[in-house]
Swiss-Prot record:
It comes from the Eukaryota. Residues 22-623, 679-691, 754-778, 834-840 are extracellular. Residues 1-21 form the signal peptide. CDD domains: 7tmC_V2R-like (cd15280), PBP1_CaSR (cd06364). Residues 645-657, 713-732, 800-812, 862-912 are cytoplasmic. Expressed at the sensory surface of the vomeronasal organ. The gene is Vmn2r1. This is Vomeronasal type-2 receptor 1. Putative pheromone receptor. It comes from Mus musculus. The chain crosses the membrane at residues 624-644, 658-678, 692-712, 733-753, 779-799, 813-833, 841-861. The lineage of its organism: Eukaryota, Metazoa, Chordata, Craniata, Vertebrata. Belongs to the G-protein coupled receptor 3 family. InterPro entries: ANF_lig-bd_rcpt, GPCR_3, GPCR_3_9-Cys_dom, GPCR_3_9-Cys_sf, GPCR_3_C, GPCR_3_Ca_sens_rcpt-rel, Peripla_BP_I. Its main location: membrane.
Length: 912
């Protein structure tokens, strides 16, 4: 029995040993942090129901780890940042202020756990892991190291740090509210679902910068960015907006996060060699500090810098000794504010309050350049390589001991400067945003909540992060300035403005940030306001606004000619073509002038075209008018002579009626040339051709009547036979038929397709030639074709009858008249076709006058000569001639011919 009990006891012990061994084995394989992170900061979580985490760049960098050490090491930090220290103190001050209020979280108090991010991604990620796990936990339990509920994070003090932290915290949907991270990628809710911020995105800042560039007329701007998310995405957005505005980025370089002489010199070279005099700097003050030293080292002073909100008010850059190089900097900053009670809270800091507060000790040592007694806290340490890249710069601890009696009132540093509380104000608003979200969550009424089908509520401290995010997305509250803080769907500040700041040097030799304008934004509406009376300091030799262009703006009269393979701001100025103008400077294309206008000599303005037509007032027109009137007077003079001597044998032998018709037609043709002179109009275009055609028709028809009479007379003299009588009525009938036929064709011409006036702008671009469009070419050719046919018949009949008796030379006169007529109009054709404008009209008038003068001279001047100067030859015996040589026995006088013809029924009558 005893042995049995012993066996059972041994078995139980074996079982217990196996179970405990298995448990120990399980614990050994549990996931845990491999080592503790070297983090510094502040914590106050005891006796508080909620804790807000904070990440602030209290230091500006980490100390490089010795590459010989193989084991992973959490690096130390260096480069105390007074600005980041003030932001951290502002968070603590705000939490204490909220805890004292009764209208926000009345039944709860807030604690905090704040870590120093050292402005380094690795430290931001270390801190994020600790926020989720604590340094001793095996897995995330959403409690900090004090055990209180972690609600949200304020931070992380830089875009790249916020991106890194949010990629970890976003996995658990932990709310993160940024106070200075403006990188546009953080607006992407797919990548960063739980990130919010109380400042606008860089999309708006880039929009503001481009508007500023456009306002000052700059088109060629350089860009330099930090080699991080803030710089890369900022410049990317800036370039896109510059391209949309048809502006150009001359160069784009980066400032290395870890000093690289090669990369830094590349950026410096771009600044020195580029023609761009305006440069945008997308970087933080910490990253910019070394670049500033490079600018000073290379003595680059003639540049205008456009600053972003990350460094525009930074005391690290805005030092009086930097003003010759960066004076006149212009840029954007979020609105500044006055925070009640903050200044007193900032002064309430002293190492004696907590001997273990290493950050306060380092602050004191750095501020007063002394060493705190019995402290091993280093300060003023800089392990970065200098600009030569060949040596380290290390500042040892001061031999002077701190007494503790030093007065903060004697300091002039960023920490105590409360005149430019811009990002500091945003730290306060970030804390309040979380507090208001928690307050809304705590006020949920059971059965009226937003969660689940039962409208459940979430409760403190058991809520989940995603439940708090529901309220954070809907956040809307009034700040301490009584201004609304509203976030949009991307978690960015929806409404607000940027101040436009300009760096001046005040009377005390310090840099002052002068507000010269503002950029208002409300949803998608933007407005840049810079009053004309704003006092802007420009760091140029002339103290005037600088120009920044690749190619100077093309003057009026030229257009931009894009250079192949170069930005659109680099171009050649090409003169506008004839007929095109550019009235403004910098036009891309020349504008065509209107139909009635033409470009001036400078191609800068459209001027009315010169109007050309054969005017009465010009020399050529006046000469032709004189010739026309003179010709008409000569014809009238001949008519007077004929009327006075109408009973003389010579006039009677020339058929007086037909002669008068010829004289009248010559007056018509000569005076019709006046219709070709002067500014054409529709009625004159129709009248000129019709009048000319009818005049020539009457003239040639009358001549044709005469030539037929001569032809019959010649046939009688040759054949000695009696022909059919040519009674005078038949000659008149020939004239009537020809004229009536011509009138019919002209009427059809005017009705169907009449000539019209039109403005010819094709022959000479600089002129508008007023001329007549002759309408139907077929009708016009038909009309004048009939005249040519009549002239040809006249010539043929008179040519046959040219051998009538010598003293009777009517046939010869008509023959010569027709020859002159043909010569003139045959010569007219090539001359007319080879001339343009008013000279073409002058050629036509000359042909009309020449042919009219030719007919007048050949038909009437010889007879007038006899009538007026040789009256003795104006007798029946003299006027009658001899029969041609083929039959000299036949004498043909006017009397004998008349007697002979009148004595028979078949005869040819030469006269009545």
């Amino acid at each position: 029995m005893a042995s049995r009990q012993i066996s059972l006891a041994l078995g139980f012990l074996a079982f217990l040993w196996a179970v405990l061994g298995a448990q120990n084995k399980t614990e050994e394989v549990q996931c845990r942090l491999m080592a503790k992170f070297n983090l510094s900061g502040y914590v106050d979580a005891k006796n508080h129901s909620l804790v807000i985490a904070g990440l602030f760049p209290i230091h500006s960098r980490i100390i490089p780890v010795d590459e010989a050490i193989l084991e992973p090491v959490s690096p130390m930090c260096e480069g105390f940042n007074f600005r980041g220290f003030r932001w951290m103190k502002t968070m603590i001050h705000t939490i204490k202020e909220i805890n004292e209020r009764k209208d926000i979280l009345p039944n709860h108090t807030l604690g905090y756990q704040i870590f120093d991010s050292c402005y380094t991604i690795s430290k931001a990620m270390e801190s994020s892991l600790v926020f989720l796990t604590g340094q001793e936990e095996f897995k995330p339990n959403f409690r900090n190291s004090t055990g209180s509920t972690l609600a949200a994070l304020v931070g992380s003090g830089g875009s790249s740090l916020s991106v890194a932290a949010s990629r970890i915290l976003g996995l658990y949907y932990m709310p993160q509210v940024g106070y200075t991270s403006s990188c546009s990628i953080l607006s992407d809710k797919f990548q960063f679902p739980s990130y919010l911020r109380v400042l606008p995105s860089d999309n708006l800042q880039s929009e503001a910068i481009v508007n500023l560039i456009k306002h000052f007329g700059w088109v060629w701007v350089g860009a330099i960015a930090a080699d991080d998310d803030y710089g890369k995405y900022g410049v990317k957005t800036f370039k896109e907006k510059m391209e949309s505005a048809n502006l150009c980025v001359a160069f784009s370089e980066t400032i290395p996060k870890v000093y690289s002489n090669e990369k830094m010199q590349k950026a410096v070279k771009a600044v020195k060699t580029s023609t761009a005099k305006v440069i945008v700097l997308y970087t933080s003050d910490i990253d910019l500090s070394l670049f500033v030293l490079e600018m000073i080292h290379h003595n680059i002073t003639d540049r205008t810098w456009i600053a972003t909100e990350a460094w525009i008010t930074s005391a690290l850059i805005a030092k009086p000794e930097y003003f010759p190089y960066f004076g006149g900097t212009i840029g954007f900053a979020t609105p500044r504010s006055v925070i009640p009670g903050l200044k007193e809270f900032l002064y309430d800091v002293h190492p004696n309050k907590d001997p273990n507060d290493v950050l306060t000790i380092e602050f004191w040592q750095t501020a007063f350049n002394c060493t705190w007694p019995n402290s091993s806290v280093p300060y003023n340490v800089d392990h970065r390589v200098n600009m030569t890249g060949k040596e380290d710069r290390l500042y040892d601890m001061s031999d002077q001991l701190c007494t503790g009696e030093e007065k903060l009132e004697d300091l002039k540093n960023t920490y105590l400067d409360t005149s430019q509380l811009r990002i500091t104000k945003q730290c306060k608003q970030a804390v309040y945003a979380i507090a208001h979200g928690l307050d809304h969550l705590s006020r949920c009424q059971e059965g009226q909540g937003p969660f689940g089908s039962n409208q459940q509520c979430a409760y403190i401290p058991t809520f989940d992060f995603w439940q708090l995010m529901y309220y954070m997305k809907e956040i809307k509250f009034k700040s301490h300035e009584d201004k609304w803080v509203i976030l949009d769907d991307n978690g960015d500040l929806k409404n607000g403005h940027y101040d436009v700041l300009n760096w001046h040097l005040d009377d005390e030799g310090e840099i002052s940030f002068v507000t010269v304008g503002r950029f208002n934004f409300r949803s998608t509406n933007f407005e840049l306001v810079i009053p004309t009376n704003s006092t802007i300091f420009w760091n140029t030799e002339s103290s005037r606004r600088p120009d920044s262009f690749c190619t100077q703006v093309c003057p009026p009269g030229t257009r931009k000619g894009i250079r192949q393979g170069q930005p659109i701001c680099c171009f050649d100025c090409i003169p506008c073509a004839d007929g095109y103008v550019s009235e403004k400077s910098g036009q891309r294309e020349c504008d065509p002038c209107g139909e009635d206008d033409w470009s001036n000599a400078g191609k800068s303005k459209c001027v009315p075209k010169l109007v050309e037509f054969l005017a009465y007032g010009e020399a050529l027109g006046f000469t032709l008018v004189i010739l026309s009137i003179f010709g008409a007077l000569v014809v009238l003079a001949v008519t007077v002579v004929y009327v006075i001597h109408r009973h003389t044998p010579l006039v009677k032998a020339n058929d007086r009626e037909l002669s008068f018709l010829i004289q009248m037609s010559l007056v018509i043709t000569v005076l019709s040339s006046l219709l070709f002179i002067g500014k054409p109009c529709n009625w004159s275009c129709m009248a000129r051709q019709i009048t000319l055609a009818l005049g020539f028709c009457l003239c040639l028809s009358s001549i044709l009547g005469k030539t037929i009479s001569l032809f019959f007379a010649y046939r009688i003299s040759v054949s000695k036979t009696r022909l059919i009588s040519m009674h005078p009525i038949f000659r008149k009938l020939i004239v009537l038929v020809c004229v009536v036929g011509e009138i019919g064709v002209c009427a059809a011409y005017l009705v169907l397709e009449p000539p019209r006036m039109f403005k010819n702008i094709e022959i000479q671009n600089v002129k508008i030639i007023f001329e007549c469009n002759e309408g139907s070419v077929e009708f016009l050719c038909s009309i004048f074709g009939f005249d040519v046919l009549r002239a040809l018949l006249c010539f043929l009949t008179t040519f046959v009858a040219r051998q009538l008796p010598d003293n009777y030379y009517e046939g010869k006169c008509i023959t010569f008249g027709m020859l002159v007529f043909f010569i003139v109009w045959i010569s007219f054709v090539p001359a007319y076709l080879s001339t343009k404008g008013k000279f073409k009209v002058a050629v036509e008038i000359f042909a009309i006058l020449a042919s009219s003068y030719g007919l007048l001279g050949c038909l009437f001047l010889p007879k007038c000569f006899i009538i007026l100067l040789r009256p003795k030859r104006n007798t029946d015996e003299t006027v009658g001639g001899r029969v041609p040589t083929v039959d000299r026995s036949i004498q043909l006088t006017s009397a004998s011919v008349s007697s002979e013809l009148n004595s028979t029924t078949v005869s040819t009558v030469l006269d009545e």
